[in-house]
């Protein structure tokens, strides 16, 4: 039950940026950021770097590196994460104010779901970022925006870690700039064909909802961290993240929690239903009411609430699944979202990894029934989703977990930047409106990088 040693650092609201900037070019440096958001879930920023071990999954194989030791395994990747956490033999009591006390933190890409469900392999796997990239970290710096505290903990020597942090200097980085226009991976006509194919599946009773996305690509040069800082300040998303890997980087501006686990309490907050913000306050308020009262958006949202109740119910204590919030409109800088909340209890004999596996990937970005929707996505979307629509988050030594759905997320790989956007299509969806929604969700991000 070893607890980490902890020191307090002077408060500054930009502490996460201040301490992470010099680390931002180091592989396995990762930042979970609450996006300076005026949002109920804007509380913690978490910085990690220099993991004691890493787990990287490509397809059927996971490579585990711990110091000089390298091994590979075809076992379930989340089982390997659980085993690696147990191997560290660090089981601190949960802290009253800090959610993360070291543990596994990183990326769980959408295509990791292929390890848990049998899916076809039609879509082109053209981005070679890992399906899972998770570090095991025995220290972290945490910024608590509610208590206005900056804490550094380590299971080794926090003063030595602070000295290391303060000795880091940011390399001189080339200014970030796009070197091409954004281009979509499907034309308007091709989107229409795919939309109508989904409608045929829906009307035949094959499925109830399918999330169809298009992907935008541009070339770039310069420092991805610069791009993230600009986007993060402009979009203020409560589940933002920056992940630096050997192969590339992931820049996430997600508004959506996937699953949180705190002392056995489970919470998931699926987003389904979107309308763009309007400049005129009165018109914007009407837009909120329109979304709140939209039968189509409420039906979409309810389908995913039922799906998440079912997924979480696979591992939750019987009778513990609840829906305390249904159809709440939350405003974000670019759009209004319709959000619901599902809660439950996790039995003491199960681990956060069991919960993550039971619900992965999140139903809000697949459709329902989930496996059939994922099959249709693989059939109709030209490329695999990779990091997009997976999760970024942590499984702490203390048993806690929190994770996002990686929407509004960019992948940087080999001089290319990829950004996808989709929407849930149901039987009464309108093709033109669904097509426009994909732009409403990411236009703000794409244009900010162009400028």
From Swiss-Prot:
Q: Which UniProt keywords are listed?
A: Folate biosynthesis, Magnesium, Transferase
Its required cofactor(s), as named, are: Mg(2+)
PANTHER family in alphabetical order: AMINOBENZOATE/ANTHRANILATE SYNTHASE, AMINODEOXYCHORISMATE SYNTHASE COMPONENT 1
Molecular function via GO: 4-amino-4-deoxychorismate synthase activity; magnesium ion binding
EC code: 2.6.1.85
Q: Which reaction does it catalyse?
A: chorismate + L-glutamine = 4-amino-4-deoxychorismate + L-glutamate
Q: Which family does it belong to?
A: Belongs to the anthranilate synthase component I family.
Pathway involvement of the protein, from the record: Cofactor biosynthesis; tetrahydrofolate biosynthesis; 4-aminobenzoate from chorismate: step 1/2
Give the residues the record marks as binding L-tryptophan: 34, 41-44, 238-240
Q: Which lineage?
A: Bacteria, Pseudomonadati, Pseudomonadota, Gammaproteobacteria, Enterobacterales
Does 4Fe-4S count among this protein's keywords? no
| Active site location | 256, 272
In terms of Pfam families, this protein maps to: Anth_synt_I_N (PF04715), Chorismate_bind (PF00425)
Protein name from the UniProt record:
Aminodeoxychorismate synthase component 1
Name of the top EC class for this enzyme: transferase
InterPro entries on file: ADC_synth_comp_1, ADC_synthase, Anth_synth_I-like, Anth_synth_I_N, Chorismate_C
């Amino acid at each position: 039950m070893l607890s980490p040693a902890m020191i307090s650092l002077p408060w500054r609201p930009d502490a996460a940026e201040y301490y992470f900037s010099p680390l931002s070019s180091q592989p396995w440096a990762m930042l979970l950021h609450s996006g300076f958001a005026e949002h109920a879930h804007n509380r913690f920023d978490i910085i990690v770097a220099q993991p004691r071990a890493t787990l990287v999954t490509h397809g059927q194989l996971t490579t585990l590196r711990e110091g000089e030791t390298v091994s590979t395994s075809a076992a379930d990747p989340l089982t390997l994460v659980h085993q690696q956490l147990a191997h560290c033999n660090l089981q601190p009591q949960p802290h009253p104010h800090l959610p993360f006390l070291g543990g596994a933190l990183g990326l769980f890409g959408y295509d990791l779901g292929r390890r848990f469900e049998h899916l076809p392999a039609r879509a082109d796997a053209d981005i070679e970022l890992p399906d899972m990239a998770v570090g095991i970290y025995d220290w972290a710096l945490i910024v608590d925006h509610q208590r206005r505290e900056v804490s550094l903990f380590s299971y080794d020597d926090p003063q030595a870690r602070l000295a290391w942090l303060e000795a880091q200097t940011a390399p001189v980085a080339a200014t970030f700039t796009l070197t091409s226009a954004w281009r979509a991976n499907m034309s308007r006509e091709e989107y229409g064909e795919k939309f109508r194919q989904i409608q045929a599946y829906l009307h035949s009773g094959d499925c109830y909802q399918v999330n169809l996305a298009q992907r935008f690509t541009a070339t770039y040069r310069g420092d991805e961290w610069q791009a993230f800082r600009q986007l993060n300040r402009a979009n203020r998303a409560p589940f933002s993240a920056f992940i630096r890997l050997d192969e590339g980087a992931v820049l996430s501006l997600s508004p959506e929690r996937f699953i949180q686990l705190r002392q056995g309490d489970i919470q998931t907050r699926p987003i389904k239903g979107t309308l763009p913000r309007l400049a005129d306050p009165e018109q914007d308020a009407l837009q909120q009411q329109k979304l709140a009262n939209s039968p189509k958006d409420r039906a979409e949202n309810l389908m995913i609430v039922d799906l998440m109740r079912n997924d979480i119910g696979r591992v939750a204590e019987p009778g513990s699944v609840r829906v305390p919030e249904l159809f709440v409109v939350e405003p974000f800088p670019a759009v209004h979202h319709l959000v619901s909340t599902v809660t439950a209890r996790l039995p003491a004999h199960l681990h956060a990894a069991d919960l993550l596996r039971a619900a992965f990937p999140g139903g809000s970005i697949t459709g329902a029934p989930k496996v059939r929707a994922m099959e249709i996505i693989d059939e109709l979307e030209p490329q695999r989703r990779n990091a997009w629509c997976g999760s970024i988050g942590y499984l702490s030594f203390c048993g806690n977990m929190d994770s996002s759905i990686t929407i509004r997320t960019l992948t940087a790989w080999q001089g290319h930047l990829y950004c996808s956007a989709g929407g849930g299509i149901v039987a009464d969806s309108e093709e033109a409106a669904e097509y426009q929604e994909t732009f409403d969700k990411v236009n703000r991000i794409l244009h900010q990088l162009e400028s």
